[in-house]
Amino acid sequence: PKKEVVFFAIGFETTAPVHMMALKEAQRRKLSNFSLLTSLFTVPPAIDAILSDPGSKVDGFLTAGHVCAITGNSAYHKLAEQYKTPMVVTGFEPVDLLYGIYRCLLQLEG
């Protein structure tokens, strides 16, 4: 191969496995012209940045259950306590999201 292929791997922690699959496939095929340029982030620091802004008007967060199934939810507990902001782990189905909103509202009222 005469041209370099650069795969821009951008996203949050849930996208990392897909990027690694691409890299493993390139290695399996012995592609010497495949590179991975990553810009991967984790969600808790992004939430921290939002909540540390004095102008932030966010009242609560619905956090992704599929992420917490891998990483756990302790980082969200710390942020919720630090900023006194509800963070509820939910799925993506409508009933899950509605229940998450309900749980956020209960915490805000409490």
Q: What are these regions, as identified by a protein language model?
A:
Residues 55-110:
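A conserved active-site cap/scaffold subdomain adjacent to cofactor or substrate pockets
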